[in-house]
Amino acid sequence: MREITRTTKETNIKASLELYGSGVAKIETGIGFFDHMLESLAKHALWDLEISCEGDLQVDAHHSVEDCGIVLGLLLRESLYPAQGIERFGNASVVMDESCVECDLDVSNRPFLVFDMTIEGAVGEFDAELAEEFFRALAFNAGLSLHIVQKRGKNRHHLIEAAFKALAVAMRRACTQNPRIGTPSTKGLL
């Protein structure tokens, strides 16, 4: 179990992650839809995840969402590297009603984000554009090369939820343990 506390002038976050857990989550960010997304992420990645975030929601949700991405990314970095005995690459396409989102990722320690989704508006108090901010903060702090691509869909709730679930399944697959692999790179270190 990895734990972190991160305090700034905008947020105070305490979080813990068990990468090889059972999908149990306790999430309290004050942003209902975002809590639901983080719970879905933990459930489908099979992580045990706790996040408690007190943020400046009177401004908006941006700082809380981005900083939760930073914290979760840091927890993942601590849990993943140096990468040994894992598949390293993961991908998944997740369907939610009319929507389908694909996630491809590389546990490479080379951060990158491709976010190719067209979503506007808000789901509750969660501005749709915050999804990209979360994924960017997560990828860059975890050291993931992360591609999230909308294949089809219109409903912003369905699109965002499919993206979080696709990330979850792709991460679960990339972190599948395989002792025959050793270091999953010809470089000898990730």
Swiss-Prot record:
InterPro entries: IGPD_sf (IPR038494), ImidazoleglycerolP_deHydtase (IPR000807), ImidazoleglycerP_deHydtase_CS (IPR020565), Ribosomal_Su5_D2-typ_SF (IPR020568). It catalyses: D-erythro-1-(imidazol-4-yl)glycerol 3-phosphate = 3-(imidazol-4-yl)-2-oxopropyl phosphate + H2O. Pfam families: IGPD. The keyword Hydrolase does not apply. It is found in: Cytoplasm. Coiled coil: none annotated. Pathway: Amino-acid biosynthesis; L-histidine biosynthesis; L-histidine from 5-phospho-alpha-D-ribose 1-diphosphate: step 6/9. GO terms for cellular component: cytoplasm. Keywords: Amino-acid biosynthesis, Cytoplasm, Histidine biosynthesis, Lyase. GO terms for molecular function: imidazoleglycerol-phosphate dehydratase activity. Its EC number is 4.2.1.19. SUPFAM superfamilies: Ribosomal protein S5 domain 2-like (SSF54211). GO terms for biological process: L-histidine biosynthetic process. Belongs to the imidazoleglycerol-phosphate dehydratase family. PANTHER family: IMIDAZOLEGLYCEROL-PHOSPHATE DEHYDRATASE, IMIDAZOLEGLYCEROL-PHOSPHATE DEHYDRATASE HIS7. This is Imidazoleglycerol-phosphate dehydratase. It comes from Wolinella succinogenes (strain ATCC 29543 / DSM 1740 / CCUG 13145 / JCM 31913 / LMG 7466 / NCTC 11488 / FDC 602W). The lineage of its organism: Bacteria, Pseudomonadati, Campylobacterota, Epsilonproteobacteria, Campylobacterales. The gene is hisB.
